[in-house]
């Protein structure tokens, strides 16, 4: 039956060609009818690709290339088939010549349209399998026909999908890199290894179908071109590859790669395969059976995934992509074989995963079951608790019912006894009545007997009446006594109840007192913790002081560095002064030369004038100037002496400063020692704090243990009371049983059994009492051990107090050291004052020297002006008198103009020096004002520091007082604990006495009960012995018994009064103890409040002291800065003084030279010449200039 014809699909025909040497040229790809140049290499290898459609599915023909014989086909399935799976067209059959003209219909793109693609196309893992196209296995043909189709290499059905994903696919990367190496064109041949690197824009995958349209249209244009597919083509781009030789590799590499792939293909042909796995496809018509989709583990699925991966990220043609797919599959076939070990491992892994899943499911189920059962469990627990409470209640009811049954049994026994006594009385009375009846019967017979009997009856009646009256009296007495006894019982019960209430009140009060004492102890521990916090604050203060000391050491280092810098600056200024001196000497030499020229002019004028009167006047003026010069020299010498003295003073001050620097170093060493001691103190404090924490924890544990011991003691005491009560009740039961033993033998046997049981219980109770006593002893021992531990803890606290005292001593030593530092600071300030005073003196002296120099300069300027006027007059006269000297006069006038310029320069220098002097004066005044302010601030600081030192001393004294008060309070607390212990002992004694009293009362009650029984027995005996015994004997016995009973009652009343008096005394003692404890507690609370207030005040004072110390530190820093500025001013003044001393030395040398000249016998003309010597004039000018500059 013919299938309907579907649309024709296109495949790719790939041919692998090997060209031996000398072989004819194979058909190559022709582009525009032109053959490419033949490659000169031997054994070339290539691939011929052709697209061909077979019944709506693409088909690939691969040919090995040996003279066009070796070829094989690969079917490419399209997942999107439009026709039926069995449709086959007659036009789509494979022709005999695989290289014939391809039909005009181009190959449409069957690439995948899925949006999921890998981001990097060079990735080697082939994980996706979402392509629509697929490659079938190779169909093996008969070996006789070399142009056969390949056999389909289907994998084993047992191999899972994971075999492809987990196997390493490095060969895929290499193959993809081979075929991605084109830059210019797409090479279809296998001429060499290609390394194509696509740009980033081409590697990106388009995320929609619209972005793929231009690529598909480009491919269609390539397929529709006439020159693209021609008859007998082998390579698609062989011409381009021949034009680009740079893309080719060596022939050896290309040959080796081609041979390797060909050998691998032949190996794949020769491998023995299972006939069930091999499908022989001799003709393309048989390929239509492969239209159904391949399973996810088959080779078709792998081919489809590879095709999708290679097709979706590249711009290559579909034929090249399919060729790459076939090559990748060739390289992947050996990797697809799964080893048995890996299959076993995978199977084991699958089993393990299955087991893990089962276990996880079981765990989830168990968790769910537990979650479901949790509310039921909670309900069951609640029900159990309720049932336990109900059981407890039922046990209590049983015990109550047992007590009621015992009481009812006791009452029944008493009733039985009373009934037995009444029956005995009834029997006795019946016997008497019978006897009387018999007597009456006997007496009825004779009359004499009647009379005697009547008399006897009368007598007996009288006796009976008397006995009845006596009996009534006795009964009344007994009733009265019984009433008295009941009243006494009620009073005793009330007294016992009141006594119990008082004891309970005392116990509660004792508990309250103990709780208050515990609270007071806790408060004391809190106070101790607060004191420790204060101690830590003090340590923080010490640390701050240490930091301040470090800052002072840093400041001293800064001062030293500033001192060195100032020294360097002084050296630089000295060098500058030397340079200025050299410049001044040069100027002096120039002035000397000028004065020599003026002297010559004056000599010429003098020779021309020869006026004796003028010469005399000039001589007088010269003498006056010489005297003034001598005076100036003397003043200069005095100034030199004063300067030397000042230098000595300054040297002394420098020595003092060096000593201060040494002291600063010593202080630094002391600071280091203090730091070491502080570190040790910190370590000690940490150890003490650790020990304190341990002691506090021990104290807490001891308190807890003490509380537990007290509770256990109370419980044991209550149990002892209960045991004693049970014992008394049992003794009473024994006594009652002994009373009942006088009944019958059966009752005695029962009572013996009961007594035996009760004795056994008594023994058990005695053993329990002994065990309780032993427990009490153990608890007492534990209590003693706890008291010992408490004593040790108190000793530890005392040790901590001692350590705190040691720390306080260390703080006092630090305070002393601080005071020493303050003293040294005060000494430094005093030295600063001395320096300021010396500076003021120097400033005053400099001002005086400046004033003197100003006066001298003014005089010299006036003299110079006079000399100038005289010289001008003489020059005018000389010009008038001698015209011959006109040229010389012109020269002199030029020299005078020069001198005038120099004088103007000197005047400007004087003006500048005066301005500098004024500024210096203003600076001095400002410095003096600052110094005064600093002195005042320093005095205020000293006063403030003294006040602070006093306050610190007072604070330290207060701290010592508080520590002493704390010690006293600790002692008081210890005394209170001792008193409390004594009170406890007294309370224990009172309890024992009360228990003794209770036992005595119970004994008295038992005696009373026994007496009542005896009275009843006596009554019965009296009733029974009325007719047999004489009344006198019975009455005497009854009276004696009554007397005994009265004596016993009196003795009991006496004992009762004694016990009441003792109880009252004990109550008074307890009240007194409670009052004392309350008073002591109030006193302790008051002291604690006072201590808290004092501590708060001390904290405030310490905070204020810290703030004041910080302010003093800031003021100290300011004072140090001002001292540094003052040092700089002093150094400037010292430099000026040195310059003045050098100037004075120069003046002295010049005066000595002038005196030597005076000693020589010179004429008046020579003296005149010496007066107008240029060196003298230059010296005068330089002296004035130097004085002004120094000012």
Swiss-Prot record:
Stretch list, region Head: 1-345
Cellular component terms (Gene Ontology): apical junction complex; bicellular tight junction; brush border; myosin complex
Region (Tail): 1149-1191
Keywords recorded for this protein, A-Z: Acetylation, Cell junction, Coiled coil, Phosphoprotein, Tight junction
Motif (ZIM): 42-56
UniProt feature, compositional bias: Low complexity: 242-259
UniProt-annotated location(s): Cell junction, Tight junction
Listed Basic and acidic residues bias regions: 212-225, 872-891
Location of the region described as Interaction with TJP1/ZO1 in the Swiss-Prot/TrEMBL record: 48-61
Coiled-coil regions listed in the entry: 343-1150
Biological process annotations from GO: bicellular tight junction assembly; epithelial cell morphogenesis; microtubule cytoskeleton organization
Keyword Coiled coil: yes
Pfam families from the UniProt entry: Myosin_tail_1
Modified residues (Phosphoserine): 84, 89-90, 92, 129, 131, 134, 149, 159, 208, 211, 250, 268, 326, 339, 448, 1163-1164
Biased composition (Basic residues): 190-206
Region entry Disordered, spans: 1-43, 63-130, 178-259, 872-898, 1148-1169
Modified residues (N6-acetyllysine): 567
GO molecular function: actin binding; microtubule binding
Tissue: Lung, kidney and intestine.
Recorded family membership: Belongs to the cingulin family.
Domain notes: Deletion of the TJP1/ZO1 interaction motif (ZIM) decreases but does not abolish colocalization with TJP1/ZO1.
Subunit composition and interactions: Homodimer. Interacts with TJP1/ZO1 and SPEF1.
Role: Probably plays a role in the formation and regulation of the tight junction (TJ) paracellular permeability barrier.
Name of the protein in question: Cingulin
